């Protein structure tokens, strides 16, 4: 592998601009070689002066790169030393508290027998668990810094050796000895000492001297590296997807033959939510694949466990498996009379199995990922009582696009409670009324507002924590427009059913607030969530200064589809109002629901890209984990202090200036990455010029 590819494959994405600009140096050397005056048409002194002037510029550039690397390495090393001291103090405090609580073993055992663990013991246990996680993240940051050290030294050695070969001189090697080999980033071995100390502390203090267990906890692949799925997983993905496609075609043919002339809408509404969930999981798998390929570190952004998280193939497998269950359940509905199973039992069995898959307490079927999702859902639905993180409001945003699932769930509960004729074998296609699909009792309107309400209270909670009206209160205003839109839609629907004369008034109010909501959310999507239409976009017209994905066309197409799908509701209202054909509203809404999931799928790419660029600007490469976090008041006070004119603002300006000096970010395919041993990057030190 060429070193340029090796460097691109193994750098930490969030520190990309702090590495040696190896490709730029190569271009300098090749350009100098191509533009050099020929010895055949000019004298030797002119050629020597040309190369002498070039070398002066070349070595000045090397000095600037070396100074940049030394500065960044020193800052990160100092940060690591401070973090190490903090973790050591927290560990010592936890161990001291643990020893004090166990000083009277008899009393402690009696307490355990009667009251199980005391509150103090539970807190200590939780602190030790948090410390293990904090040390593993800290160890990862040390490995990344060691990797930074090794890659930059190898980069200088390679480029200076190439310099000597092209210019037929030894001044590059001399410069390396005089400058690089004595540079602080290379000579400083404190990083190795910190790594060794961390391994020792985790082994002796947290894993009771079991080094194998300690190293298993510490060793981790680099963030952003694709975790190869087993061959059987790949096989199952292909098998499930193939079966799902074939079954869907069979369902369409069977349904058009056996259900012709029947009222299939209750069955469609009941099964529609399951299909949208399967579509969402499959598209999320594509999101995950795209993020990995582009170098968007979603593992860090979602604060996932880098040792154990779902890859795109795992998501495809889950979506395919659930898709097959969904198809078999629908088949059983259609052919219920032939298999002696009442039609209305099939959805209950299907969604019961899906729920069981999610809450299964055994450590099987991606237990850690399912438990992470359940905790996240709990945090989303109890938003006012927790500090809101990125994963929390990201999931709530997904729920806003999956609101149809909640509405279909409400319909299913209502239908089974009031409309279903349990004695009929074909109850799902033999409904006498459609009360459950209306706003008659107001429950449907409340359910429709739940996702927007969750984001609304999240924004209020973030405002409480940060005291920043913009963007949090402004964002809350965006979600509040949904409440008005749904309210007037419900009023219009109920007044129209009862032939009230004021129905048209509510219709126009509904349209006005729908229009306001769509414009509000569209502007927020493009400007705030995606960071587009930046004044400093430069050559990236209408985009932003830095872009991750390789083609600008991706961004322009995403803007167009977002505009179209944000206003797709106008088609539904127009067709429904004009009554162009039977069941127009149901047909259009069934088509638009998966399109909204697709819009959110596209939104995810650019929302995480924007968050990734924020992490790059802050050089944040690992999770921030603290055993003793600041409370909300202290956090607010600290942020206010940092906002002073002589504080962090100057650093922000400096970061903006630095970002303006760089080109678009792009990470090559991760297939070129090599495996790590003990989570340490091994740099190929070969001197073979074919590999440079």
UniProtKB/Swiss-Prot annotation:
Composition-biased stretches (Polar residues): 660-674
The residues that cross the membrane are 237-257, 270-290, 318-338, 345-367, 376-396, 402-422, 470-492, 504-524
UniProt feature coiled coil, ranges: none
**What are the SPX domain coordinates in residue numbering?**
1-177
Q: Which GO terms describe its molecular function?
A: efflux transmembrane transporter activity; inositol hexakisphosphate binding; phosphate transmembrane transporter activity
InterPro entries for this protein = EXS_C (IPR004342), SPX_dom (IPR004331)
Q: Where is this region: Disordered?
A: 660-692
Q: Transmembrane as a keyword?
A: yes
Which membrane topology term applies here?
Answer: Multi-pass membrane protein
- Segments in the Cytoplasmic topological domain: 1-236, 291-317, 368-375, 423-469, 525-692
* Residue span of region Important for inositol polyphosphate binding: 158-165
Q: What is its main location?
A: membrane
Looking at the Swiss-Prot or TrEMBL record, what is one Pfam family this protein matches?
EXS
Is Cytoplasm given among the entry's keywords?
Answer: no
Q: Which domain of life is it from?
A: Eukaryota
- What's a single GO CC term here? plasma membrane
Its family remark reads:
Belongs to the SYG1 (TC 2.A.94) family.
Under which name does UniProt file this protein? Xenotropic and polytropic retrovirus receptor 1 homolog
Q: Which organism is it from?
A: Xenopus tropicalis
Q: Which gene encodes it?
A: xpr1
